[in-house]
Amino acid sequence: MTIIRIGLDIAKHVFQVHGVDENEVTVLRRQLRRSEMKKFFNKLAPTRIGLEACGASHYWARLLRVLGHEVVLLPPQYIKPYVKRGKNHTIDAEAICGARY
């Protein structure tokens, strides 16, 4: 399982992670608490992570870059076309990952 891209939806208390492999097959779908973020991404091999640009995204982008990941901040209007159905954290993380930044 080689994750090439991760979409990360950040919220106040929980974060939704969606990762795909080189064949665009979902290989990671997980919800993390704020306290688990650093430990989880520290164990993960360096990869490309997309975040929706918002107030807290710059903090998390800096932290993830320190851990060796490549982070891309995406404006919300670039992600909206990739949302296939209703709105929740899981769907948003999948849409961020699907934006193919």
PLM features per residue range, with description:
Residues 1-101:
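Phosphate- and other anionic-substrate recognition elements at nucleic-acid/protein interfaces
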